[in-house]
Amino acid sequence: MIAAGDFRKGVTIEVDGQIFTVVDFMHVKPGKGAAFVRTKLKNIMTGAVIERTFSPTEKFEEAQIERREMQYLYNDGEFYYFMDTETYEQIPLSYDKVEEAMKYIKENMIVTVKFYKGEAFSVEPPTFVELEVIDTEPGVRGDTVTGGSKPATVETGAVIQVPLFINVGDKIKIDTRTGEYIERV
């Protein structure tokens, strides 16, 4: 059991028979009246985001999420296919379950797939990935009015802000939690 006052981002709870992940939360202590916790919850099966308010002492059952290492194989236009690295079992996942993670995942990459009661609902890329820059404008010396960064498209199609010295063909390290450039590899 977890109290609403102990919520953190990423905690998975059961509310009204459905499973939600805490996307955002805020403890509110008004001048008058009791304190409360305002939350944004994402339904793990439907992807719908709702806003709910709870008392800080209200308790919820923490959902038991299974995590498995899987290898991304391919996309057939409708589904993304992942293979369990131990059993070699393949599972298809629809775009709505993997859309955010696919910005950083390329074929044959090992990822973490989350399951609830045997059903896959989400894909988590590694914390750091190394991807090749396929398109960016050339950096001009002395052009630091924009803060010394420019947009670059990597091989998965994601657009990342990178320093001016990064060129097409460079491999860069990206933090998948924030989508930020870390270093040139």
Swiss-Prot record:
MF terms in GO: translation elongation factor activity
Nucleotide-binding recorded as keyword: no
Chief location category: cytoplasm
SMART domains found in the cross-reference section: EFP, Elong-fact-P_C
Keyword Cytoplasm: yes
Localization of this protein: Cytoplasm
Intrachain S-S bonds: none
Domain of life from the UniProt record: Bacteria
UniProt GO BP: peptide biosynthetic process
Listed pathway(s): Protein biosynthesis; polypeptide chain elongation
Keyword terms of this UniProt record: Cytoplasm, Elongation factor, Protein biosynthesis
Gene Ontology CC terms: cytoplasm
Family classification: Belongs to the elongation factor P family.
Described function: Involved in peptide bond synthesis. Stimulates efficient translation and peptide-bond synthesis on native or reconstituted 70S ribosomes in vitro. Probably functions indirectly by altering the affinity of the ribosome for aminoacyl-tRNA, thus increasing their reactivity as acceptors for peptidyl transferase.
Name this protein carries in UniProt: Elongation factor P
Lineage: Bacteria, Bacillati, Bacillota, Clostridia, Thermoanaerobacterales
